[in-house]
Amino acid sequence: MARMPSGRVTSAKIVIAGGFGVGKTTLVGSVSEITPLTTEAIMTSAGVGVDDNRQVPGKTTTTVAMDFGRISIDRDLILYLFGTPGQTRFWFMWDELVKGAIGAVVMVDTRRLADCFAAIDFFEHRHLPYLIAINCFDGNQYHSAQDVRDALAIPSDVPVVACDARSRESTKQVLISLVEYVLTMRRQRAATPA
């Protein structure tokens, strides 16, 4: 990873997004070095007919505002993580959650690819750099990064990586990949004449 100037701590905001039950809260919880702040609520009848939990039948809670965590990538870089709620009825909060973010991780469950289209569209329309993180659930058929890229029709420069949202090291690598991508994009923009 590109080194930040030593002696100066840099912090950055990262948004973790994706569909309902894709692993956003799990990712924030697995990598955060502080006890994550979550806004999990018991699922109620308000979600009946709205939230499709057939692929996550054991899910009994859901994020209703955001998840928050923090990780020090090294002594010079601290990332603040903001997980979005996955249900469409909470998307009105996304504009506030992305203010000041340098980039986003879009979590993908390959059993429900369509659930991440809205997040991809959201970040593309706001020109916020993002990467795709394929959450490899137990028993989930693995699809190559290229297969997922093709299915989502995303640009070739957008990183697509596999991860296990339950693994601290795996999710840390996702975050490092996003920061490196953002830094590369910024350098390219700075080198391009206006």
What are these regions (language model features)?
Residues M107-D157:
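Conserved C-terminal guanine-recognition region of P-loop GTPase G domains, centered on the G4
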Residues Q87-R111, D121-R126:
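Inter-motif core of Ras-like GTPase G domains
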Residues L81-T84, A104-D109, I132-C136, A162-D164:
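Conserved beta-strand segments of the P-loop GTPase G domain that flank and frequently precede/overlap
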Residues D138-A194:
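Canonical P-loop GTPase G-domain recognition
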